[in-house]
């Protein structure tokens, strides 16, 4: 990760932006991801990358008592869908595969992603009013 960030935001954006999306992603979506990568700050990026590589999500989820669902793009090359499914199974949570989507599923399939957000909002609203 340090090598990636040492090359600079522009080089990282050029080399990695498309990998966060599904194969054949829209150029506008690749440009959106690349623009975000160009704005990354070295220390923040390295801290986040370290946490993702070294922290154990199970330590956090073992004590979690709230509602949980696991979402993953069907074509995610960063977080493998099989591993996301395993997390859902382990914690008895629903697994939602986001069709035609990579890691940045909110860009690849924004309609499906937003429908899921709206569904959750309705569930929470219904809980609060019943």
Regions found by a protein language model. Name each.
Residues 63-64, 70-72, 76:
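Short beta-strand/loop motif that positions the catalytic acidic residue
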Residues 40, 79, 108:
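Residue-level signal for the nucleotide or nucleotide-sugar donor/cofactor binding architecture
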Residues 6-63:
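Conserved alpha/beta-hydrolase catalytic His-Asp/Glu region
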Residues 16, 49-52, 87, 113-117, ...:
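Hydrophobic "lid"/C-terminal helical patch
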Residues 50, 69, 94-96:
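Structural signal for short hydrophobic segments within the conserved structured cores
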Residues 91-130:
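Catalytic active-site module of serine/aspartate enzymes centered on a nucleophile-bearing elbow/loop
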Residues 77-83:
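Conserved alpha/beta-hydrolase "acid-adjacent" motif
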Residues 64, 90-91:
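Short, structured coil segments at secondary-structure junctions
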């Amino acid at each position: 990760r340090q090598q990636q960030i040492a090359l600079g935001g522009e080089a990282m954006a050029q080399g990695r932006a498309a990998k966060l999306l599904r194969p054949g992603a829209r150029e506008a979506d690749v440009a959106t991801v690349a623009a975000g990568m160009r704005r990354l700050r070295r220390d923040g990026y390295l801290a986040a990358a370290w946490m993702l590589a070294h922290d154990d999500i199970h330590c956090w989820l073992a004590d979690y008592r709230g509602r949980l669902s696991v979402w993953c793009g069907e074509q995610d090359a960063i977080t493998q869908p099989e591993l996301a499914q395993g997390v859902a199974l382990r914690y008895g949570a629903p697994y939602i595969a986001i069709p035609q989507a990579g890691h940045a599923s909110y860009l690849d399939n924004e309609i499906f992603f937003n429908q899921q957000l709206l569904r959750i909002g309705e569930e929470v609203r219904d809980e609060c009013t019943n």
